[in-house]
Amino acid sequence: MIEVKNIAKKFGDKTVLKDVNLEIKDGSVFGLVGTNGAGKSTLLRLLTGIYEADEGEIKYDGEPVFDNEKVKEGIVIVPDELYFLPNSNLKRMAKFYESYYKSFRRKRFDALVETFRFDKEKTLSKLSKGMKRQAAMILALSVRPKYLLFDETFDGLDPMVRQAFKQIIIKDVEDNNTTVIFTSHSLRELEGVCDTLAFINNDTVVFSGDIISIQNSMFKIQVAFKEEFDKDTFEGMEILGFEKNGSVANMIVKGDREEIEQKIKAMNPVLFDVVMLNLEEIFNYQVGASGYSFDMSLLEEE
């Protein structure tokens, strides 16, 4: 299990992360979602022990990760900005991985190369972005680590390759109890893969939890009453969005779904309907509620 407690990180005077707390269970597929520049990549580098936290601690099965080679042997990361040895090909990189990771499986590597029809002899620096990412993922998956971390996971991969890698990763989780962490600014990439999510905004985790709980904690309600009403009618409820057209209002509500349904039904509405939100909608409303938005009025013509 990975425990992240009260983590903070600065670069100079700039605060990148503050008061970050997470618990990632073994065998889970954990998605770390946030806008560009939210701190996802920094947190991933803290999780791998590349960076040292200014405050707080990160532990793997009770052991600190920073400056701990024993823990790091069980962690493999595919970063957003890929790095390969100068003038290397996949064949040479496999030897390098094999020399560092005791768990590197040559048979697994050969099978992945054959599956994706990857030319091991081609110089990696001359390949496209998508092919470089394929190479990095083949190497990472050949290690069969206990902890597998991906930054902007499927960026540059075509749809068929992306789906194939997803299937391989999910099978590793099922067969080997691998713990996987994905970061992305696109929830569509992670939906259907992750069982747990954390949303980062304004340098910290806004909320986290298993996907079912998250989807049940925020929803859209369509409601109407005989009498006149406005947002204040629903005092005591956390309303993230309220729009009224005529006598019908559409609201985005955060909280215990069953409890909120009971409260509104007790108000005797003439129309009442609950609509589930997808994860991308939840993320957009949550981030908007915490102050991230664009002032589109600046683009209006004078």
Where are these regions (language model features)?
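Conserved structural motif at the start of ABC-family nucleotide-binding domains
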Residues: 2-4, 17, 72
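The feature captures the beta-strand-to-loop junction immediately N-terminal to the Walker
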Residues: 30-35
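Helix-to-loop junction immediately C-terminal to a conserved catalytic motif
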Residues: 48
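Conserved ABC transporter NBD signature motif
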Residues: 56-71
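ABC-family P-loop ATPase nucleotide-binding domains
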Residues: 79-135
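Catalytic Walker B motif of ABC-type/P-loop ATPase nucleotide-binding domains
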Residues: 148-152
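ABC transporter nucleotide-binding domain
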Residues: 165-255
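C-terminal coupling/interaction segments
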Residues: 252-302
